[in-house]
Amino acid sequence: MTFLHGADKPLQISRGEYATDKDLFPVTMAACALVSARVRDQAIFIPSWDVQELSETPSETFYNAAVRYSNGCENSKQAYTLNTLRCFALLALTAIQYGKIREMQLFLGKYHTFVAMDGLHDESNWPKDIGIVETEERRRLVRYMIQRKTSANDQ
């Protein structure tokens, strides 16, 4: 998941910022859902990770929290944040991990709709005040999701 590259993300999560940041919470829950599902399916091969601890909370608990807290963002009149887009990308990946193709299509659809609504496929429409790290994160997310869309069309 190269679109979660930012060095500040682990720090934000370790400090518990996701508990009070309504933009960070859903993407954190979505990331936890994917990791937990991959651990459960024995698809994680990082020796330093404590697989037992990562298995304690079912993936669906994180997934449902991410879905619940991301609901309603469709009604926002504001531009969609990078974390909102990441959340939908991660939910789509987790749905693939669960074998739920319809849900994968739902979250891919939300992602691509929001990108289209704000013209975020064009870097000139991105916020002007983002730094190099966020610019690269956005580029990686766009590339990754274009690849997923292509793969999903083959389903």
Q: PLM features: what roles do these ranges have?
A:
Residues M1-Q155:
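Acidic, Ser/Thr-rich, low-complexity intrinsically disordered regions in fungal proteins
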